[in-house]
Amino acid sequence: MQAFGEGPDITPAFLVDNFPWDSLGTGTVVDMGGSNGSVSMAIAQAHPALKLIVQDRPDVIEAAKENELPKDLIGKVEFMPHDFFTEQPVEADVYLFRYIFHNWPDAYAVKILRQLVPVLRPGVRVVVNDHLLPEPNTASLTTEREVR
């Protein structure tokens, strides 16, 4: 499993450096299932004009709030409890899904994405930063066991 936890695409720096965040100006990014907010904090530090909202389950958000937010990120990174299987309440410029969909069958991934429809408008971006799984029965048995 170590191989799946390493590499340039697993670090927040890869996402921070390889998406045109500056093109959003003072836009809002919702980090869906954003856990403790570490990725949102990395984005906010590199692109201070952005506002980031970290959404996750209430228990995860409460735990995240126990950690003190760096002073330079106060007012730039917020935490909000939200179940991504319910309608998205925040209008944003980007909805970020980082390592979310590989945990769910396709039908659930579709259900998660459908919850964005009411707040989508022209120009809104849905960013998916996730593992790509090989087609079933195309990798070695060892790899299949590790990734599924």
Regions found by a protein language model. Give the residues of each.
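Conserved Class I S-adenosyl-L-methionine-dependent methyltransferase catalytic core
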Residues: 1-27
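Alpha-helical subdomain
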Residues: 17-148
